[in-house]
Amino acid sequence: MALQPCVIVGLGNPGIEYATTRHNVGFRVLDTLAQRYRVQLTQQRRFLGEVAEVLIQGQKVRLLKPTTYMNSSGQSLHALLNFYKLPLERTLVVHDDADLPLGRLRLRLSGSTGGHNGIKSIIQHCHSQQFPRLKVGIAFGDRLQQQTGPRNAVPFVLGHFSATELAILPAVLDLAVDAIELSIQSGVEVAMNRYNGKSIPLPQA
């Protein structure tokens, strides 16, 4: 049976100072999805985040942007899943990936934290690694040749996209939303086959 998500979570940090950072690309994907379906995400204290309900491919889907800050994202997701009695396995988590080049997506059915603190928090609070993720690449230029690690990752992910990177960012966000739509319609596995090999051409550094 196809794994079709009914909850889409975009990871990021709240606050205007973080809004345009690379680390917030998960938030921006969710905003793009909400705009496509003309719905408004609203803050709900019960869920420690901004939420909306939308019909996608005829299915009711809940959107969530945790406003707990990245490192506590799991608190928000756990609250929503517990309230609606929904399984973690049907949650698709959208987040940035500093090991993937900007313009690339990678869907995974499950896995470890991959060094991402938002994913780490979800695993800790929901007590499982068994949930699909949509990783959105943010690496660009010299970053593609660097080793990712705690020492150099933080300044990069909390930095802002350059004008060159911003030139393709809208297309990247649209591609990510397309992948979400197909995941909901046909299952994450089908979307993996279609989108894991696709990329938006990178601009020249």
UniProtKB/Swiss-Prot annotation:
It catalyses: an N-acyl-L-alpha-aminoacyl-tRNA + H2O = an N-acyl-L-amino acid + a tRNA + H(+). The record marks 96 as: Stabilizes the basic form of H active site to accept a proton. CDD domains: PTH (cd00462). Its EC number is 3.1.1.29. One of its GO terms (cellular component) is cytoplasm. Pfam families: Pept_tRNA_hydro. Belongs to the PTH family. This is Peptidyl-tRNA hydrolase. It comes from Thermosynechococcus vestitus (strain NIES-2133 / IAM M-273 / BP-1). The lineage of its organism: Bacteria, Bacillati, Cyanobacteriota, Cyanophyceae, Acaryochloridales.
